[in-house]
């Protein structure tokens, strides 16, 4: 007897972040990404991991740069695309909690200059492109676009 599609579908879950979660994603889906830099970022503030079954599919967090300012980061696997709406809702709730708990007035995020999918997602999340390209920004000298989300903006999540 064949199983129905809904009976076999596994919904994502959120768990507290563990450094090993990001390591699994990087080893599996992003071998070109600098694991040391990612681990330092991931261990420097509140973070969560999205899981489907026994596999992490994404990690996200906020590094507290200085009082009132956070730097948002995210590392995702290719599997995350199937859960985009869920991820957006969970991440918005996470950012609201972090903003409230830490008294933030500004969030920043960077995305690779050639990654239009993630640029569009940051826009959906309410971040606004600051304009221009920051060349040589990452440890491996890749260029990024900087995005901001500032208290008082119409997209501020509070």
Regions found by a protein language model. Give the residues of each.
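A short beta-loop-alpha structural element at the N-terminal edge
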Residues: 2-26
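Active-site rim helix/loop that mediates acceptor-substrate recognition in acyltransferases
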Residues: 30-47
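Conserved beta-hairpin
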Residues: 45-60
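A conserved beta-turn-beta hairpin within the catalytic core of GNAT-like acetyltransferases
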Residues: 64-74, 104-105, 143
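Conserved acetyl-CoA binding element of GNAT-fold acetyltransferases
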Residues: 68-87
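Conserved acetyl-CoA-binding loop-helix of GNAT-fold acetyltransferases
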Residues: 83-99, 120, 124
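Conserved beta-strand-loop-alpha-helix junction that forms the acyl-donor binding cleft
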Residues: 104-123, 136-137
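Conserved catalytic-core motifs of GNAT/GCN5-like acyltransferases
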Residues: 110, 128-144
